[in-house]
Amino acid sequence: MTTDVISADLKTVLRRLKLGRMLDTLPERLVLARQQKMPHQDFLTLVLADEASRRDSLAVVLRVQRGHLDPALQLDAWDATAKVTFDRALLNELTTLRFLEAHAHVAIIGPVGVGKTFLAHALGHIACRRGRTVLAMRTDHMLKTLKHARLDNSYDAEVRKLLAVDLLILDDFALDTLDPTESRDLYEILTERHRAGSIIVTSNRGPDEWLITFADPLRAQSAIDRFTSNAYDLVIEGESYRQRLKPTLKSAAP
């Protein structure tokens, strides 16, 4: 099989146009074009489609990284034999991301270890693959970040980050009792994103227990009412899923 030599001039031009990665597949595409006597336009379409596909894949990787999503927590890695129960039809509906289109929210509720974070991140991965921006973080980490941001006058910038993404995932929501500043910050995020951007929360508590974690009952009632009135509740029950994620020793070869 004849291997086409890519000229130095072509390499230079491709790199100037930021198309240098096309060189990875260009030789084999040239061979294919010769074998199939491919018209020039079809060949150009083929190599540009390769580049578009590569850029799309890279964009997904970057969205996942910037969103702080766990690479291992994807729906195709979910253990279907796990002894947990939840509304599968609702999960299937959520994977369509129609809730994102409607700026609706999701509350994933259940005891410790049943896979709440797993499913939240799995939905985040689906969103990234479909071109949406995501940010996942623990609720306490978000509130600490906002508290520290007040000290260096970066508070407004941090809030903009939380409001700008298509999907905000808050893990361990309503886990701890909030002080007045934290209550106010959480109120701001929940109300500003109401019907403007979707939120997924994971929580060990049901929505009826969230109110007691806020320092300000009036703000709490307002924020929680906005959220719950526009949220799907995915309730998970059963044994700990987390044990299935434990590392295990592989059997040594005989």
Residue ranges and their predicted role:
Residues 1-12, 247-254:
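Intrinsically disordered, low-complexity and often Lys/Arg-enriched segments
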Residues 11, 19-70:
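Interdomain "pre-motor" coupling segment immediately N-terminal to P-loop NTPase/helicase cores
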Residues 89-164, 211-213:
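Conserved P-loop
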Residues 8, 12-15, 24-27, 45-46, ...:
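Solvent-exposed alpha-helical segments within well-ordered globular domains of core cellular machineries
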Residues 73-95:
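N-terminal pre-Walker A segment at the start of P-loop NTPase domains
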Residues 167:
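Walker B motif beta-strand of ABC-family P-loop ATPases
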